[in-house]
């Protein structure tokens, strides 16, 4: 999967604790599902070679966030779904917030689509970028009975923050090496704003 840019709720916040508990509880329903930190993947395939490059990515994220109106939340859940893809087996779908889209497009222009970046990044953000928070990574088929339990657990979790995560919770960017098994992924750098 390469190197990714994650946007995360800060540990200890309601959003982090609710999502982490939800991820762990769903993991118990389907054997072989790894545990991972709550996050929204902004972009993958970052072109970073060293710590200096990681710092530039995080500095760019920090600068972008400063342009967003205070109190505005980039993360707003719109739905949830079960999919066939391993990394999107169960997800909370997020609205395509204009600031989130701008952030994703800019990061892709600067650090992924190095050549002919603007046109490709514009196409990607409109046609391919599906903002979401993964709740499970797995290849297994989800049974109807498990789906009913998943539905109830997600519903219960969403009631805790009324489908509106606090803009104060989501404030950490991480550059993550996503090579090998999920348990071996490494955070190369992070910034909390």
From Swiss-Prot:
GO biological process: cyclic nucleotide metabolic process
Pfam families, per the entry: CPDase
Disulfide bonds: none
Localization, UniProt: Golgi apparatus
Gene Ontology terms for molecular function: 2',3'-cyclic-nucleotide 3'-phosphodiesterase activity
Reactions mediated catalytically: a nucleoside 2',3'-cyclic phosphate + H2O = a nucleoside 2'-phosphate + H(+)
Keywords: Golgi apparatus, Hydrolase
Active site feature: 39, 132
Transmembrane domains' residue ranges: none
Coiled coil: none
Catalytic activity, EC: 3.1.4.37
Superkingdom as given in the UniProt entry: Eukaryota
Residues where substrate binds: 41, 134, 137
Cross-referenced InterPro entries: Cyclic-nucl_3Pdiesterase (IPR012386), Cyclic_Pdiesterase (IPR009097)
GO cellular component: Golgi apparatus
Similarity field: Belongs to the 2H phosphoesterase superfamily. CPD1 family.
Primary role: Involved in the metabolism of ADP-ribose 1',2'-cyclic phosphate which is produced as a consequence of tRNA splicing.
PANTHER family, per database record: 2',3'-CYCLIC-NUCLEOTIDE 3'-PHOSPHODIESTERASE
Name the record gives this protein: 2',3'-cyclic-nucleotide 3'-phosphodiesterase
Species of the source: Candida glabrata (strain ATCC 2001 / BCRC 20586 / JCM 3761 / NBRC 0622 / NRRL Y-65 / CBS 138) (Yeast)
């Amino acid at each position: 999967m390469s190197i990714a840019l994650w946007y995360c709720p800060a540990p200890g916040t309601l959003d982090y604790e609710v999502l982490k508990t939800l991820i762990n509880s769903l993991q118990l329903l389907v054997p072989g599902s790894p545990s991972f930190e709550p996050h929204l993947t902004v972009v993958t395939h970052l072109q970073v070679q060293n710590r200096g490059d990681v710092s530039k990515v995080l500095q760019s994220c920090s600068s972008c966030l400063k342009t967003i109106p205070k109190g505005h939340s980039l993360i707003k859940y719109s739905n949830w779904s079960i999919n066939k893809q391993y990394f999107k087996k169960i997800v909370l779908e997020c609205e395509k917030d204009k600031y989130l889209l701008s952030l994703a497009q800019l990061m892709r222009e600067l650090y992924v689509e190095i050549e002919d970046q603007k046109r490709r990044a514009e196409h990607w953000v409109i046609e391919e970028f599906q903002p979401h928070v993964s709740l499970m990574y797995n290849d297994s088929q989800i049974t109807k009975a498990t789906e009913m339990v998943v539905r109830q657990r997600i519903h219960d979790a969403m009631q805790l923050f009324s489908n509106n995560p606090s803009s104060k919770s989501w404030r950490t960017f991480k550059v993550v090496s996503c090579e090998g098994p999920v348990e071996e992924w490494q955070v190369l750098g992070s910034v909390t704003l």
